[in-house]
C-alpha cells in the first residue's frame, strides 16, 4: 500500500492516505498524519516542508481492524491484540473506529513478519496490521524492539532466547 516515497511530485496522490515522516522515528502526532481530503494532504505536506522533512512515505488508507503485534524472529513467540486494548501513542487508532472482529490467520502474519525481520535484520519486532472483512491484511508499520508492555513477561523469555542464539 505504499503510494510514494520522495518529496518530488506529490500532487497526484489520492486520499484518504497516511503521510509518514521517514527522517526519524515518530516523535509527535505530526510525524504520522491521516489525510482524508486533498486539502488535508496539502496542509500535511506544507507541515512537513516547514519542518524540513525530506524523506516521507504516503500510504493509502485501509479500512478494517487495526491489530498491534509483537514477535521475536527465530522463536515461537508472537503476540497480537486489538489496538483499542493497548496504550495509544498519538490516538491515530480512532481513524478506523471500533474493531469488528474480522477473522484472520495470526500464524500467517507471524510468517510474513519473521520474513521482514530477517530481511531487515530486526529480530525483535512489533508493528501494526490492518485486517479487512475477508481476512486479508496489510502491514502498515514495523518497528525494531518495541516496548512489549502488553506482553512483557512472555516476550522476555523469547527475547533472551533469541539474544543467546
Predicted regions and their residues:
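Short beta->alpha connector loops
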Residues: 3-8, 61-64, 123
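Residue-level signal for tight coil/turn positions that link beta-strands
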Residues: 14, 73-74, 134
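A conserved helix-loop-beta module that forms one wall/lid of the active-site cleft
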Residues: 1-32
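A short glycine-rich, hydrophobically flanked beta-strand micro-motif that places a catalytic Asp/Glu
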Residues: 56, 67, 122-134
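Phosphate-binding site of ATP-dependent enzymes
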Residues: 30-120
Amino acid at each position: 500500500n505504499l503510494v510514494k516515497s520522495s518529496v518530488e511530485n506529490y500532487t497526484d496522490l489520492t486520499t484518504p492516505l497516511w503521510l509518514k515522516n521517514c527522517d526519524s522515528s515518530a516523535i509527535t502526532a505530526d510525524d504520522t498524519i491521516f489525510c482524508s481530503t486533498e486539502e488535508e494532504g496539502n496542509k500535511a505536506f506544507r507541515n512537513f516542508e516547514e519542518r524540513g522533512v525530506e524523506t516521507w512515505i504516503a500510504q493509502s488508507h485501509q479500512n478494517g481492524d487495526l491489530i498491534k503485534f509483537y514477535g521475536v524472529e527465530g522463536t515461537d513467540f508472537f503476540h497480537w491484540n486489538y489496538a483499542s486494548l493497548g496504550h495509544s501513542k498519538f490516538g491515530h487508532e480512532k481513524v478506523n473506529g471500533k474493531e469488528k472482529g474480522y477473522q484472520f490467520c495470526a500464524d500467517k502474519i507471524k510468517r510474513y513478519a519473521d520474513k521482514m525481520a530477517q530481511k531487515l535484520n530486526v529480530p525483535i519486532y512489533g508493528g501494526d496490521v490492518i485486517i479487512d472483512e475477508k481476512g486479508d491484511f496489510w502491514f502498515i508499520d514495523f518497528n525494531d524492539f518495541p516496548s512489549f508492555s502488553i506482553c512483557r513477561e512472555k516476550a522476555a523469555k523469547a527475547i533472551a532466547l533469541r539474544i543467546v542464539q
